[in-house]
Amino acid sequence: MSLVKKFITVGGATLGSRIFGFARETLMAAALGTGPMADVFYAAFRFPNLFRRLFAEGAFNAAFVPLFAKEIEANGIDGAKRFSEEVFGVLFSVLLLITIVMELAMPLLVRWVIAPGFADDAEKFDLTVRLAAVMFPYLMSMSLTAMMSGMLNSLHHFFAAAVAPIFLNLVMISALFYAIYFGADPLTTAWYLSWSVLVAGVLQLAVVYIGVRHAGISIGLRFPRFTPNVKRLLLLAIPAAITGGVTQINLVIGQAIASGKEGAIAALQYADRIYQLPLGVVGVAVGIVLLPELARSLKSGHIKEAANIQNRSIEFVLFLTLPAAVALWLLSDDIIRVLYERGAFNANNTTLVGSILAIFGLGLPAFVLIKALQPGFYAREDTKSPMRYTAIAVAVNSALSILLFPVLAERGIALAEAVAGWLNAVQLFVTLYRRGHLVWEWSLARRTAMLLVSSAVMGGVIVYLSHRWEPLLGSGSTLLTKTGVLGLLILIAMAVYFIVAFLIGGVDVGMIRRNLKRKRPAPASDAKAVNGE
């Protein structure tokens, strides 16, 4: 499968999952608004979701896929099957133990970690504990799903692993439709949603398990043993978990601080869902394009080529995220109004969530740049530097959130996350440059300036059209009118940005092609290419 086809498969599925996520959040906004029940559910769901991001997705895929692919090359499918069974036995046992411990300690976790601000409200606190207890086993399903997804990617079976995440949103949407159709109250709706999370985890695991069986591997449960391969997996996964989970760590810190104000957690969640769309889709593109190219160049000793690929990846990220950041800043209220403003979600909620989204947009280029810069360390087997910079960013985020929340409330938490993201990105960039892994290019600096100019011109067009079409975008218009006008405005803005960028030299067709295409590698190296996918 060519790189472009892999991008379409994985990136398209990611986009589909984000779209279904929007639908889910829209229904949740209508059913729960930003009231206390929304706060309770999101607080309870954030904890298993954090563990999923830290251990199931980024860390496990970064550690397991290279070792599994290496085992395929060295010992064939039989060796890979043996390795996967070793990992499965240990992973299943560890996850079962973690789940039992967390279930027993859930009241303490809610009081001190998940939502300290709920401690003074006995009813709110008790419900958060019970909902979190229902949803936490989702971690177990998702971790095993991540392992089998890594196997599928190494075997070049991308579809099942790519579509599995969609089932979470589909099942939760079904639960919301059921609740709304039968007129369930917010409490009952929260229970429906909690059980739907657990059901979705089982379905996702079933999808990838069937995919692995179809790919020719049947996994058996072995007695857990910490073999050398398993130990190596753990050594790789721990720093990757800490580094890759910086966004989720920042969100949990923000949630803990925001729990002191009713509605703050839900408002941050609604804004984060939209912000994650460009972050997730572009991040997938960077993962597919950059990592295999960079690893292959370094392995073959082409140091200058590796530096060039790193620079082109930065250019590619800025090309996509700078205009997205401007659009999120200027259109935040209109986007929130179209997606969420109905039912229990009113105009005041739109203003609040829109302001949070605008600030999140400022951090968008930084968080995608992090995804483009970290492979420069991982490809050179340096996992400690990104982990150290992540720790610094988390500390700064915590301090700023505490300082800004009394002044700016939810907006202060969003601003702290954006600042921490930029600090992390700058540290990664400067370190790569000082080590000689990034080569300064005046052409890159000039193109970055031209992309900023193009984004500014696009922003001017957005401001002008938003003012002219304000009556059509306002709360008094029908949903169909608002959606159509907003869609047209975004299309015009995109056209203006691309035209200006091409005309003034901000980007060229060749750059896009270099980032989206590569020659098909020889079979011997094909499995290694999966490491970065």
Swiss-Prot record:
Any idea where this protein resides? Cell inner membrane
Does Transcription regulation show up as a keyword for this record? no
| Principal location class | membrane
Q: State which residue ranges cross the membrane.
A: 25-45, 90-110, 131-151, 158-178, 192-212, 233-253, 274-294, 316-336, 350-370, 389-409, 412-432, 449-469, 484-504
Part of which pathway? Cell wall biogenesis; peptidoglycan biosynthesis
The UniProt entry, under Pfam families, shows: MurJ
Q: List GO BP terms, alphabetically.
A: cell wall organization; lipid translocation; peptidoglycan biosynthetic process; regulation of cell shape
> CDD domains given for it?
MATE_MurJ_like
UniProt GO cellular component terms: plasma membrane
Which keywords does this Swiss-Prot/TrEMBL entry list?
Cell inner membrane, Cell membrane, Cell shape, Cell wall biogenesis/degradation, Membrane, Peptidoglycan synthesis, Transmembrane, Transmembrane helix, Transport
User: Does this UniProt record's set of keywords contain Transmembrane?
Assistant: yes
Give the membrane topology. Multi-pass membrane protein
Q: Which GO terms describe its molecular function?
A: lipid-linked peptidoglycan transporter activity
Q: Which PANTHER family match?
A: LIPID II FLIPPASE MURJ (PTHR47019:SF1)
Reported function: Involved in peptidoglycan biosynthesis. Transports lipid-linked peptidoglycan precursors from the inner to the outer leaflet of the cytoplasmic membrane.
The record's family statement is: Belongs to the MurJ/MviN family.
Official protein name in the record: Probable lipid II flippase MurJ
